[in-house]
Amino acid sequence: MFKKVFTKKVVPFATVTTIALGSLIGVTVYDKVEAEQQPQVQTAKQTQNAMHAEAVEQIKKENPDIKNVIFLIGDGMGPSYMTAHRYMTDNPKTPERELTTFDEHFIGVQTTYPEDDKENITDSAAAATAMSGGEKTYNNAIAVDNDKSEIKTVLEQAKENGMSTGLVATSEITHATPASFGAHDHHRDNMNEIANDYYDEMINGEHKIDVLLGGGKKNFIRDDRDLTQEFEKDGYGYVTNKKELVKNKDEQVLGLFADGGLDKAIDRSANTPSAEEMTKSAIKRLNQNENGFFLMVEGSQIDWAGHDNDVVAAMSEMDDFEKAFKAAIDFAKKDKHTLVIATADHSTGGLSLGTNDESGEGIYNWSTAPIKAAKKTPDFMAKQIINGADVEKTLKQNIKLKLKPEEIESVKQAAQTNDETKIDNAIEDIFNKRSYTGWTTSGHTGEEVDVYGYGPGKEMFSGLMDNTEQAENIFYILEQMKQNK
């Protein structure tokens, strides 16, 4: 098992060099003192910036024929998550370690830092604003700059161009990432106001977002306002489950499938659409516009799992998001005029594959078997237990492992506190210890994240780039599309 190697060529040598040098740069390259002390790092940074700039200029000369842009964000999906996902999907019967769909389309990395006086590690709002509007800003900002002035987003530019637009998320559709593409607010927590923006802010007399699919019903149906009724009056379809989504044929649709965020992929009922199903539904509707479309898709809860240090949920969400990415790629392959870019906003949790054993010795191993043994997330099991379910029965029903008496006892002791978080943590601890999964934080981490691409113009997103360049490139593409009409 541990002698597996890659036997396929993943990326060109130049790109491999880009990543190798990119790993040297890290966040310290932005510390002037460190850069002066390490001139080789500064040189590496300059080299990679030049390589990226050359790729951008070359593709601009070629003026690729792009009609649609699909931009996917795996929230919290740092490099360790990609490695873990590769181990999870590997075929143990083959000598090589198979590539994931992500691996097949790897093109570069991006930096993620915000422009915040107090914090140099980004949150989702600042990162999404950088990728949607091309400007650095403070943590918590929703498409506004440090002066709290609105920043135009690529989604808004697409709508100005006469294109159809869509947002898909497994969180509330008003959460930080989708909000930073379709709304403006000084703070991400103002999700009711963000929902209002989705309806109230018009472009050329039209609602700026044609397809909204995700969670967050509570932000749309409130005592002061029922936005679902307002959207329906304006011709939108309104759906609340997978069956209704499939049945509905409206080009404009509001789909709210949970009061808050959707359940984790492994926990979802059959009547809740997956990220893949929402993505396919959005593409089908948006593609009816002869002027093209812009779609942002977020795999929101990779991040939530990382905050919770829950490896079961994290791997479940990675699988869900990869299927959405593949759906976008499959459409682009048939369409020939669609650019697909996938990346992350940051990494979450400080996930490590391999950790210390109980004696403090480092374990040179990471095991997927305990993770694959889970039928549900620890969070799901904790909710059942807090609602009165028997601890041992719940664990044995949802974990296909022979549990140790001390593991069961640890959850029983947590259950005696009537604290759902402590129960959840006790169950997560079983999977983390069994799989040798480590975590350093319940927050975000500051490393670069991977970028993946397919379709015409993908080279503009290759090499080492900053997250603001995602928006800069898309704005350029949208302008060229407008001129080429």
Model-derived regions, located:
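Sec-dependent signal peptide cleavage junction
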Residues: 23-39
